[in-house]
């Protein structure tokens, strides 16, 4: 069973879409094994997205991710990383496939509702960033 990390971003929380997006995730066969609502500081958001530090959008991303509450979750499913990235769609909602989370709910490339890990290795690192091992609970 593979795991991936998602973050329902501040725009998702602000638009009161936590339930709608979580429902779509569960209906796609993902099991939520860790979940919490939190608010990232600029420092925490900067640390999480440090891999993008040299990219032109880094400052805007850090500002946005620290602008309000977010909901990180660890999801479990066979082929979780690839299947989740298919479920959420392209980063730019204008390019996202019909029926994907971003096509349905995102307003722009910068405010695109949801983060999804890009590899199993990064999913493990990102999951540990938000959750201690004892916070990850599998229910059979």
Swiss-Prot record:
UniProt keyword annotation of Kinase present: yes
Principal EC category: transferase
Residues annotated as binding ATP: 9, 57, 85, 91, 102, 112
Subcellular location(s) of the protein: Cytoplasm
GO cellular component, one term: cytoplasm
Keyword match Acyltransferase: no
Protein family membership: Belongs to the NDK family.
Function: Major role in the synthesis of nucleoside triphosphates other than ATP. The ATP gamma phosphate is transferred to the NDP beta phosphate via a ping-pong mechanism, using a phosphorylated active-site intermediate.
Name of this protein: Nucleoside diphosphate kinase
Taxonomic source organism: Chlorobaculum parvum (strain DSM 263 / NCIMB 8327)
Gene: ndk
């Amino acid at each position: 069973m593979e795991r991936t990390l998602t973050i329902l971003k501040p725009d998702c929380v602000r638009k009161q879409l936590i339930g709608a997006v979580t429902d779509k995730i569960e209906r796609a066969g993902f099991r939520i094994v860790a979940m919490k609502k939190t608010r990232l500081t600029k420092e925490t958001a900067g640390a999480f997205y440090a891999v993008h530090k040299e990219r032109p959008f880094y400052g805007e991303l850090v500002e946005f991710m620290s602008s309000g509450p977010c909901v990180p979750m660890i999801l479990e499913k066979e082929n979780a990383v690839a299947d989740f990235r298919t479920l959420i769609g392209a980063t730019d909602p204008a390019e996202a496939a019909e029926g994907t989370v971003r096509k349905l709910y995102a307003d722009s490339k910068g405010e695109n509702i949801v983060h999804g890990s890009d590899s199993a290795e990064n999913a493990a690192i990102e999951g540990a960033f938000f959750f201690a091992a004892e916070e990850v609970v599998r229910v059979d």
